[in-house]
Amino acid sequence: MSINVKSVIEAALFIAGNEGVHKDKLKSISRLSVQDFEAVMEEMIFEYEKDPQRGLVVRKVGENYKLFTKPDISKIVASGFGIKQKNPLNQGMIETLAIIAYNHPCTRSQIHELRKTDPTPMLEKLIEIGLVEEAGRSEAVGKPYLYQVTPKFYDIFGLDSIKDLPEIVLPEQKIEELTYEEEINFFDTNREDNGDE
């Protein structure tokens, strides 16, 4: 019996759930050459995205491939299951997150310089929900903490790396609001820091 390789890949992604499957592992499962595997994955990403009869999409996040629920379908299913979808980011958090993403890693004082307001409450919340993390200390006077975005940031915003961020013309201009719409997957640090600066 001939088995379609895309069906095998789909099943592997389904079983892996939220964790996804590393590209090397998935290639091994598919038994394809590197070139053929990359071509098949590009096809699957395109097909899942464009097919209106599919409720899922395939995405590459870092080195992993994962299945996600399409945003419009996610809302319907969430409503059916009684799951409330809520955007946890206010405008200040969005601006702080964007500054960190475009200037990573950066210190609290650097964020303050760009936003002209104390970023502490925003940082604490972003760390709590897992979008920002500490990245060591700066060599500047006082050795303040450095902050960077987390893998969850790339996951939620569908980015492979920082290079995939949209370009902005001038850092002084207000950074365009990012759309935070966490896709529910139906498969199955916070720390106190008052002495940063």
UniProtKB/Swiss-Prot annotation:
One GO BP annotation of this record: DNA replication
Keyword Transferase on entry: no
Q: Which InterPro entries match?
A: ScpB_csome_segregation, WH-like_DNA-bd_sf, WH_DNA-bd_sf
Q: Is Cytoplasm given among the entry's keywords?
A: yes
Q: Enumerate the subcellular locations listed in this protein's record, separating them with semicolons.
A: Cytoplasm
| UniProt keyword annotations, A-Z | Cell cycle, Cell division, Chromosome partition, Cytoplasm
Pfam families assigned = SMC_ScpB
Domain of life of the source: Bacteria
- What's any one GO cellular component for it? cytoplasm
Q: Member of which family?
A: Belongs to the ScpB family.
Assembly with partners or alone? Homodimer. Homodimerization may be required to stabilize the binding of ScpA to the Smc head domains. Component of a cohesin-like complex composed of ScpA, ScpB and the Smc homodimer, in which ScpA and ScpB bind to the head domain of Smc. The presence of the three proteins is required for the association of the complex with DNA.
Functional note? Participates in chromosomal partition during cell division. May act via the formation of a condensin-like complex containing Smc and ScpA that pull DNA away from mid-cell into both cell halves.
Name the HAMAP family for this protein.
ScpB
User: What is the official name of this protein in its record?
Assistant: Segregation and condensation protein B
Q: What lineage is this protein's organism placed in? A: Bacteria, Bacillati, Mycoplasmatota, Mycoplasmoidales, Mycoplasmoidaceae
